[in-house]
A protein has these predicted regions:
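C-terminal nucleotide
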Residues: 1-26, 30, 51-85, 180-336, ...
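Short Gly/aromatic-enriched secondary-structure transition segments
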Residues: 38-45, 224-225
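FabD-like malonyl-/acyl-CoA
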Residues: 127-129, 347-352
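Glycine-rich phosphate-binding loop
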Residues: 344
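Short, charge-rich binding segments
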Residues: 43-45, 53-56, 103
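A short catalytic or substrate-binding loop motif that flags glycine-/basic-rich loops and adjacent residues
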Residues: 33-35, 44-46, 281
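Gly/Ser-rich oxyanion-binding loop with an adjacent helix/lid
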Residues: 1-21, 27-40, 74-79, 85-200, ...
């Protein structure tokens, strides 16, 4: 079946696209909100994501249209505006700018972008950047190693868009392997792909969209990171540890024993952010061992605990997402679930029993729309599987 982005491209340009780039979305069952503090994470790429039908343009112009957003974007590949423009294409301007700082870009492209799921919670921003970068590299005959691709995509969000994300999203979308759990240390970028044990019960990945799309640019995402940094900086000061600049401080720099000794000196909000970090770090480590042993029930329980910590210690999540989380906790056949992504609107993810998928979708949908009837037609549910990361 022909992709919608291909159909639209052919209608606009009266030719077939040169190629179709793809980057998967991701879920991160464990490791929420700690990648920017150099924590450890668990992740999986899924078989839904961003497609872009494209064709090279020798004149160096980038011309893009999204099926998810209005207005076409256009700019020169070697003359990206210094300041973001405030629209959906800022992520791609940032990607071109970051790539152009290391490589000579001469060839542009025309492209039509299509996301296969609603926006919010599955790292669509990282996916579209990586999808675009893979196409831009191909037409300019540039080869990026996986970690270089990850860091270029991250820099586009950090330095151009202005979102202080860590590298969780990009790493999951690049490094993942089907039927494996990515176990990544975001401090030194070491990682392991843990195969799904033959003894593990089968599972599917369910995605429940709240009906509320989110943008990190207008959320408390960056504030939460500042609170984590502030907690780390204060703890280092109380303990008499050597410390550098505030910008370069992370909770990973502070041993748990120091937190235990001085946590009562912290403002309550900073203490709770740190509590989430240390408990989530431990869950990510324990989760990797559960996955290795094939203990899906144990792993799922950790995912539920992660969701609870995100609500009460990290304090993210709107009423709608909290309701979805509550419903998931009380639904037979769901091994574990939590907010997906930052948790500011968007969606929830769950690891579910394949034999109970339809019953789960019915129960979650009925209970959620009973609580929020105004979201009927905007709420949606999907079932996915693990997938390989992007391949250049």
């Amino acid at each position: 079946m022909k992709l919608k982005c291909v159909e639209v491209y052919e209608g606009l340009y009266h030719q077939e696209p040169f190629d179709v780039a793809f980057c998967p979305y991701r879920i991160s069952p464990l490791g929420a909100h700690i990648d920017h503090q150099y924590g450890k994470i668990n992740g999986l790429a899924i078989d839904k994501g961003i497609h872009m039908a494209y064709h090279p343009k020798q004149n160096g112009i980038i011309e893009l249209q999204s099926l998810n957003f209005p207005k076409r974007a256009q700019f020169f590949v070697n003359a990206v505006p210094e300041e973001k423009q405030g629209d959906w294409a800022d992520h791609l301007r940032g990607a071109a700018k970051m790539l152009g700082e290391k490589y000579r870009l001469k060839i542009g492209l025309s492209g039509v972008i299509e996301g296969s799921l609603p926006i919010g919670g599955l790292s669509s921003s990282a996916s579209v950047i990586i999808c675009f970068l893979s196409a831009l590299c191909k037409v300019n005959d540039i080869h990026l190693e996986p970690m270089e691709l990850i860091l270029t995509a991250k820099a586009a969000e950090n330095q151009y868009v202005g979102v202080s994300c860590g590298k969780l999203d990009q790493s999951c979308e690049v490094l993942s392997k089907k039927n494996h759990l990515l176990y990544l240390d975001t401090k030194d970028d070491s990682y392991e792909l843990i195969p799904t044990s033959q003894s593990m019960k089968p599972y599917k990945i369910a995605i429940f969209f709240s009906g509320l799309e989110r943008s990190l640019k207008n959320s408390k995402y960056n504030l939460r990171q500042d609170e984590c940094k502030a907690a780390a900086y204060a703890l280092m000061g109380y303990a008499g540890m050597d410390y550098g600049t505030f910008a370069d401080t992370r909770l990973r720099d502070v041993p748990y024993e120091v937190f235990e000794a001085y946590k009562d000196h912290l403002p309550e909000l900073w203490r709770r952010r740190a509590e989430h970090y240390y408990s989530e770090f431990a869950r990510a480590e324990k989760g990797a061992e559960f996955w290795r042993k094939g203990d899906l029930e144990g792993y799922g329980q950790l995912v539920f605990e992660s969701g609870k910590s995100s609500i009460y210690s990290y304090e993210c999540g709107c009423d709608e997402l909290k309701k979805l989380y509550e419903i998931m906790r009380n639904t037979d056949g769901i091994y574990g679930g939590r907010f997906s992504g930052a948790g500011f609107k968007g969606c929830c993810m769950a690891l579910v029993d394949p034999e109970k998928v339809e019953d789960i979708k019915v129960k979650v949908t009925e209970e959620y729309l009973k609580a929020f009837p105004e979201l009927e037609g905007r709420y949606s549910a999907y079932v996915c599987e693990s997938a390989d990361g992007v391949r250049l």
